[in-house]
Amino acid sequence: MAKTIVIKQIGSPIRRPEKQRQTLIGLGLNKMHKTRELEDTPAVRGMINKIPHMVQIIEEKG
């Protein structure tokens, strides 16, 4: 079974650069306090590291 990671959006995309908004959309987040469970891959980790002020890692599974 693959490792998964649960992330939560804690920052608003309002008044943020377009690249940061697109990164949120790429992670499947678009509303405040929404959570997603994603596969823990280098691509997902890289996207999270680009916007650490807007997302929070809730839990790492596996």
Swiss-Prot record:
The keyword Cell division appears for this protein: no
Single GO BP term: translation
One Gene Ontology term of the molecular function aspect: structural constituent of ribosome
SUPFAM superfamilies referenced in this protein's UniProt entry, alphabetically: Ribosomal protein L30p/L7e
Ribonucleoprotein listed as a keyword: yes
GO CC aspect terms: cytosolic large ribosomal subunit
Signal peptide boundaries: none
Keywords carried by this UniProt record: Ribonucleoprotein, Ribosomal protein
Highest rank taxon of the organism: Bacteria
Subunit structure: Part of the 50S ribosomal subunit.
Annotated HAMAP family: Ribosomal_uL30_B
NCBIfam families, sorted: rpmD_bact (TIGR01308)
Record-stated family: Belongs to the universal ribosomal protein uL30 family.
Protein name from the UniProt record: Large ribosomal subunit protein uL30
Lineage: Bacteria, Pseudomonadati, Pseudomonadota, Alphaproteobacteria, Rhodobacterales
Gene: rpmD
